[in-house]
Amino acid sequence: MTLTPARRRGHEMLDDPSHDAALAERSLHDVALANRWFGGRRAILREVRQVLARTPAGMTLRLLDIGTGLGDIPAAVQRLAGRDARHVTTIGLELAPALAHVAHGACSHAVAANALALPFATASIDIVTCSQLLHHFEDETAARLLRECTRVARHAVIVGDLRRSWVAVAGLWLSSFALRFHPVSRHDGVVSILRGYTRAELALLIARATGRRAVVRHALGWRITATWFPGFNAT
């Protein structure tokens, strides 16, 4: 028996745009908790740290976090930058105005906008991060998102997502009770994992969408990251 199931779409309850705003916020709390305990935040910070090392020390950077949720990743980036005496202005983006408002306290700025039509000029953002959002889209729409990320990024794009695995499914299901996840979060979390990617799948999706060769790495907690630099083509 393979530990990597076939990729499947399933149905995440909170993908329904008519969902209750309070339930969505509760689910975002569960996502932030999962990011903390299962490595989603650490995986993104690992990549951000390497990008910061490539940029001049005195430079003020702009970071856009797409699908920011509660803004836990921008907040963690600011703490990381502060330890190295770096200054990073963070922008959290959510589709729903109510959720953007929730994220505002954790980011320098919060914006309600469509990730498929980002309201930013080309190459106007130094670092673009996108954590656990890509798997919500069918491949054609996911490619549009990746192209938008590449368009607005000046230095780097960092995508974090889930590695598809039966072990990850079992781990999430069992730990969700101890962490007191809402039942909707538990259901959607399992579906999210089954929508996740292998390293080869994610690299191919990015190359086909953007023409860039991403550095794709596994991370603890059945996570996967992909980082690429808009100025370098996949040649």
Predicted regions span which residues?
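N-terminal auxiliary segments of SAM/dcSAM-dependent transferases
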Residues: 1-17
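Class I SAM-dependent methyltransferase Rossmann-like catalytic core
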Residues: 17, 21-47, 51-52
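Class I SAM-dependent methyltransferase SAM/SAH-binding core
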Residues: 62-117
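A conserved beta-strand element that flanks and buttresses the S-adenosyl-L-methionine
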Residues: 129
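A short, conserved alpha-helix within the catalytic core of class I
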Residues: 137-148
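Conserved beta-strand signature within the Rossmann-like core of class I S-adenosyl-L-methionine
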Residues: 153-162
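C-terminal alpha-helical "lid/dimerization" subdomain adjacent to the S-adenosyl-L-methionine
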Residues: 162-209
